[in-house]
Amino acid sequence: VPAQPAVSIHGLRKFYGDTRAVDGLDLEIRTGECFGLLGPNGAGKTTTVEICEGLNQPDSGTVTILGRQWATDAADLRPRIGVSLQETQLAEKLTVEETLRLFRSFYHGGPTVDTVIGQVQLNEKRRSRVGQLSGGQKQRMALACALVGDPELLFLDEPTTGLDPQSRRQLWDLIEQFKAQGRTVLLTTHYMEEAERLCDRVAIVDHGRVIALGTPCELIASLGSEHVVEFTLLDGKSPDDNELRALGGVHAVRRTGERIFLEISQLHETLPPLLNMLERLGTGFAELRTHTATLEDVFVSLTGRSLREE
């Protein structure tokens, strides 16, 4: 018998005035997976997660968390979930240890405060005031507050936004350790590398709807192209899109201002004829970059916009 889903969302809608924050969203998150909600700011990710956390009310649709619903089972659900908000405001004057003892007192069971402090690598800071912690330490502290009740399901809203690369990787390690214990994680992010590393499956959300769903590998494979060539040209005649599409191995052509993007199968198949074409037109590359296709490219190909655009 398949395990019941950790989170089940059907026909979820939420309006703020005339704005549709969430517009008929359907999702099912399996027990034990790390699931990513991916999308630009304003896509409806945070609203969806807040409704799942019981912090916000849907206008219509059903949301079932761990087989329960907030309207009838809030007291049962609260101790079973952990929540790390986009910005967690903790009492600045309390120490790390005092804060975690306070949060631990809200739950019947769970790990000791010492265990959690060790897990999030804040042993050396246990007597420091929360206000003295760095950005990365504060994010690990927020995660510790979410873990102290030993949750079955962990909600992380943009857990590494604003962190330096080292702090981001430390937090990724902690999330992976939590998932390795068979727990479920729902995270929102607009960092593609984060989603590709942590998530078993992702849903790409835009304008409050799921526009793509699958493993990171499946979604990238759906592009049909392994590489992206990005270039700008020196002054001169620019080839038109049809000429570019006629080159070997080109699946799609996009333009953003002066920049031209080609989604291609193999570099050796496309670059030599591209160089010949540009030479014939009396122009050349002002700038040239290539990268392996990512979830960012999937999003751009679906929406025509970058994930980082406000």
Region spans (language model):
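C-terminal coupling/interaction segments
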Residues: Q266-E310
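ABC transporter nucleotide-binding domains
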Residues: Q4-V7, K14-A212
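ABC-family P-loop ATPase nucleotide-binding domain
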Residues: V1-R13, R305-E310
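A generic structural signal for secondary-structure junctions
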Residues: G82, R104, H108, A221-S225, ...
